Amino acid sequence: MNKLTSSYSPVHVIGGGLAGSEAAWQIAEAGVPVILHEMRGVRGTDAHKTDSLAELVCSNSFRSDDATSNAVGVLHAEMRLAGSIIMRCADLNQVPAGGALAVDREGFAEAVSAAIAAHPLITVLREEIRGLPPKEWDLAIIATGPLTAPDLADAIRAETGADALAFFDAIAPIVHADTIDMDICWHQSRYDKVGPGGTGKDYINCPLTQEEYNAFIDALIAGDKTGFKEWEGTPYFDGCLPIEVMAERGRETLRHGPMKPMGLTNAHNPSVKPYAVVQLRQDNALGTLYNMVGFQTKLKYGAQGEVFRMIPGLEKAEFARLGGLHRNTYINSPTLLDQSLTLKSRAGLRFAGQITGCEGYVESASIGLLAGRFAAAERKGASPAIPPVTTAFGALLNHITGGHIVSDDEPGKRSFQPMNVNFGLFPPLDPGALTRPEGAKRFRGKEKASAKKQAMASRALSDCATWLDKNLLIGGAATR
């Protein structure tokens, strides 16, 4: 396909993951040419299996798609409003997952790759960038993610004058569906919740008795684990703790976490409530693969087979992919980046995605979306328009560029940590924003918390729509 030429100089985007792909798309949609540099195809990583753009290396879930009362769902909706290629391809490749938006990981990555390749203003170069962008690349975005190659990571550290922070991330196993014993397991979403493309029976559930649960916990804790080596002392991100680390924190931790039995009824024995339940979520459109929800692990491969086949219904399970462990790195964004994600020490150089310290697929993609819009605006001679902090975009951006800063003279100075989007990042509602249920003098039980979330979600989507309307990135002049 012939690429278009443009009166604008290109913006360079380094990294073709979720954030880099989204950034490139937003820039190109604004009429500015993009050169997207991706090293996979020349050099691999410890976690990626393909050369596809936007490959999902951990879960296949984009989490809740509820835009009425869930912060992640609100972020989904805002990204759709902004023309996100990541959300478009996710919607086109969704698989049933209760109230969540989950995707066929291969179909999703292939769709993103095809869209990027077909865009007339995007050129993809398969090459490793070993240092910071040269000065002649006056506008560039680094979106190399948590697995940034060592040479580039060293260059970033040299430029910022501080070591990148690091944390471990762990990957959950994937099981062949036809090796799961459905005489023991059953299909059901928690509380029978129906989500996008779902039926209320979107998960496979494996029940455990108290005796089976305790035996599983003992084996999990005793299982042979991957050594830390030079990564000793690196903290985990709480949202992706290895399951054995959770078990070590207390025998009941898993039963109140990923193995909680609430909202589930054993179809084979409805009168007996399981002591614990392991859930598996559909991983591909064909329904032939299921991933073990919340079962990210650093157990060695041999131990994984032994321990996970103790779970009722998985005694003969065959694994399409075993779990694993890799190190994620991110910069100290609040001290290094301004509100437009530009490195304070170097004009025109932005960071986006997980390397900025956001956590989660859509969070990473959304920061790529913003970085792309900011870079496109700058290329066109305009000032980047910062989204209101009342939006999911703005709340997450504010956390990254301004969160967790405590003055040097305060004792117990806190460090910046990765964060998923959540309503705790949003500013409080204005007084009187909540209205009590009709005819009621006050909220009952959890009504107030629910009403607060709904009001924050409504405010976010309204403010986001207004922000986008005021800051349209109209495609620029381009010719063949």
UniProtKB/Swiss-Prot annotation:
Q: What is its main location?
A: cytoplasm
Which reactions does this protein catalyse?
uridine(54) in tRNA + (6R)-5,10-methylene-5,6,7,8-tetrahydrofolate + NADH + H(+) = 5-methyluridine(54) in tRNA + (6S)-5,6,7,8-tetrahydrofolate + NAD(+); uridine(54) in tRNA + (6R)-5,10-methylene-5,6,7,8-tetrahydrofolate + NADPH + H(+) = 5-methyluridine(54) in tRNA + (6S)-5,6,7,8-tetrahydrofolate + NADP(+)
Q: What is its EC number?
A: 2.1.1.74
Q: Name one GO molecular function term.
A: flavin adenine dinucleotide binding
Location in the cell: Cytoplasm
Domain of life of the organism encoding this protein: Bacteria
Task: State the family named in the UniProt similarity comment for this chain.
Answer: Belongs to the MnmG family. TrmFO subfamily.
The record's section on NCBIfam families has: gid_trmFO, PRK05335.1
Give the protein name, as stated in the record. Methylenetetrahydrofolate--tRNA-(uracil-5-)-methyltransferase TrmFO
Could you tell me which species this protein originates from? Answer: Sinorhizobium medicae (strain WSM419) (Ensifer medicae)
Q: What's the gene? A: trmFO
